């Protein structure tokens, strides 16, 4: 593990940390962190800023300090650990003017250098997906729980894609299932506040550490009907008051008032019509006093106005609300992007003769055919990156006959031809 990541750090640390472009400038490299920082900062809103004034944070897998520097402004201390001494050296250089940021070399399997109950916030992104050992990932989950203060939060990303029948290494690591997260958090008295992106490479989960015995206490809790109130129900992707009965847009947000503070995914239930949805996240309390409860709908047979019930296990929490369910629209395949397979920000400029396509609404990926400049593409690799929108990543090499210049890429799926795309091949 250490040798592999030291070699990657020496070759091009920015590329392997923020996979997308080689030899990035420092400004460009730090800019790649924006979306992740937004995700992490949204979790901090669970606690008012004055109550976070003395918080300490830990990043697992800090690499060269890409996330630590912008996150340091939120904490009195922020610590980062990494298995690569080359990455830690880069982090120390990048953070030399950030006195509250402290990178540490670790053994790659534990957080032994920190005592229990040390941190208020622990986070990790694009790290566990590179760990080939399921046992090491499980050990880090236990260590995260150990070093968190009671009442502290963790925001962690795992690779939730289905396991593959291939050997694992320090680039394509082990996968983690939603059931493993649910079982671990239940066993360790963790309030599970989010489990998003199931079945994708970027599966995020949010934990809050509770006292020992907390989970058992929740099983017996009862709340008077009407404890909470659903103020509105909207589509999760828009403010529209409805959702399709199935497909990529079949998810909703409940905007709830007076949700119990201990509410988590283990105990909160949302029933739409006769079927249970899957609660994926419970958001922080907003300025208007409401919390967003995100729900993936089951495949519904009925359409029209359906009742929506919010429950704590089997007991009702709120008066019924309603949701307008409509039939799903037709599935229309889409070629979302075409990039160089190594330089992912090169758009349609192909520099390495390796092409990466992203397509959505693809029911039968092996019907995908492609040609460049009229020459059929040979071997293609298919990877489902998100089952909900049926998103597939398709990789191939340019045919040998294709030289530098402009060439038309034509993609078809069965008998359907997609709009052609012009590629600029440089080598």
Regions found by a protein language model. Give the residues of each.
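Short beta-strand edge segments in extracellular beta-sheet folds
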Residues: 322-328, 423-427
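Short, compositionally biased P/S/T/A/G/V-rich stretches that sit at domain boundaries
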Residues: 220-243, 328-348
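A short acidic, Gly/Pro-enriched loop at the edge of an enzyme's catalytic core
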Residues: 112-122
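Short loop/turn motifs at secondary-structure junctions
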Residues: 53, 74, 99-100, 118, ...
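A short glycine-rich, Lys/Arg-flanked "PGG" loop and its adjoining helix->strand segment in the class I
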Residues: 138-150
């Amino acid at each position: 593990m250490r040798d592999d990541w030291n070699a990657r750090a020496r070759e091009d640390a920015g590329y392997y940390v923020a996979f997308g472009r080689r030899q990035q400038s420092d400004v460009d490299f730090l800019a790649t962190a924006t979306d992740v920082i937004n995700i992490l900062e949204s979790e901090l809103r669970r606690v008012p800023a004055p109550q976070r004034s003395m918080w300490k944070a830990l990043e697992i897998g800090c690499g060269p300090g890409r996330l630590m520097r912008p996150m340091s402004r939120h904490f009195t201390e922020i610590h980062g650990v990494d298995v690569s001494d080359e990455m830690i050296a880069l982090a120390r250089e990048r953070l030399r003017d950030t006195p509250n940021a402290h990178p540490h070399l670790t053994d790659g399997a534990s957080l032994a250098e920190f005592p229990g109950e040390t941190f208020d916030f622990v986070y990790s992104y694009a790290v566990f997906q590179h760990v080939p050992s399921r046992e090491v990932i499980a050990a880090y989950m236990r260590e995260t729980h150990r070093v968190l203060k009671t009442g502290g939060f963790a925001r962690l990303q795992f690779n939730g894609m289905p396991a593959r029948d291939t050997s694992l290494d320090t680039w394509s690591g082990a996968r983690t299932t939603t059931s493993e997260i649910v079982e671990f958090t239940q066993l360790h008295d963790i309030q599970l506040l989010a489990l998003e992106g199931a079945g994708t490479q970027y599966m995020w989960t949010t934990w809050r550490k509770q006292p020992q015995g907390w989970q058992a206490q929740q099983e017996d809790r009862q709340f008077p009907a009407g404890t909470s109130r659903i103020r509105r129900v909207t589509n999760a992707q828009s403010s529209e008051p409805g959702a399709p009965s199935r497909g990529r847009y079949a998810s909703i947000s409940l905007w709830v008032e007076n949700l119990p503070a201990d509410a988590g995914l283990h105990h909160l239930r949302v029933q739409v019509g006769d079927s249970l949805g899957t609660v994926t996240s419970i958001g922080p309390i907003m300025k208007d006093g409401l919390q967003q409860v995100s729900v993936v709908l089951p495949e519904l047979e009925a359409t029209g106005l359906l009742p929506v019930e919010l429950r704590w296990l089997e007991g009702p929490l709120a008066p019924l609300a309603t949701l307008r369910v409509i039939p799903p629209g037709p599935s229309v395949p889409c070629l979302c992007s075409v990039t160089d397979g190594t330089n992912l920000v090169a758009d349609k400029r192909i520099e390495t003769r390796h092409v990466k396509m992203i397509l959505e609404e693809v029911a039968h990926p092996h019907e995908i055919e492609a040609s460049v400049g009229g020459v059929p593409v040979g071997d293609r690799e298919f990877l489902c990156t998100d089952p909900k929108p049926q998103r597939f990543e398709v990789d191939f090499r340019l045919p040998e006959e294709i030289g530098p210049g402009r060439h038309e890429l034509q993609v078809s799926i069965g008998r359907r031809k997609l709009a052609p795309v012009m590629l600029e091949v440089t080598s």
